[in-house]
Amino acid sequence: MGIILASSSPRRKKILEDLGYNFKCISPNIDESNNNNLNSIDYVLRISESKASHVWRCYKDSHVLSGDTIIDFNGEIIGKPSSNNEAFKIIDKLSNKTHSVISGLSLFYDRKAITIFDKTDVTFKKLSKSIIKNYIESFDVLDKAGAYNIEDAENILIKHIDGCYNNIVGFPLKKFKMSKIKTILDNL
């Protein structure tokens, strides 16, 4: 029995490694569409739970941890862009405005599930079209919710952060440190 991270996110992997956990990664392949028109928190938890349960079905003796991150902009759920053109539109829409980054974590083990989430508000600077274009050409924007990686964007796009920085990275670290998930993983 061990820990499996059901994620392909290098950022989640690094945070878990930095916390001292030994685990293996398995990338789940699930449908992330929002067919049920869920609100942003319910949606991110459903996707996180789906990833964990999908992997757990094949590794029932393991503790499977998964996560998901989305952007909530005035009730609109924004995930990963499918093209640089879509990434441009997303960043342009967020320019000079505040949005919420919501990350969820789910742990599946012994036919049980635990989920947590956190929300961080991020305000973008007023961005010119050329700054957005240069950002998209300089960084990989297609595998990040909202078309940006906080580690690349902080000095370019971001005006203000209110909440947990690591939540923007994709791991609600403050909530995790106080959660039953951490207690369970620490006792394996």
Predicted regions: what is each one?
Residues 20-35, 113-115, 119:
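Short glycine-rich, Thr/Ser-proximal phosphate-binding strand/loop in the N-terminal lobe
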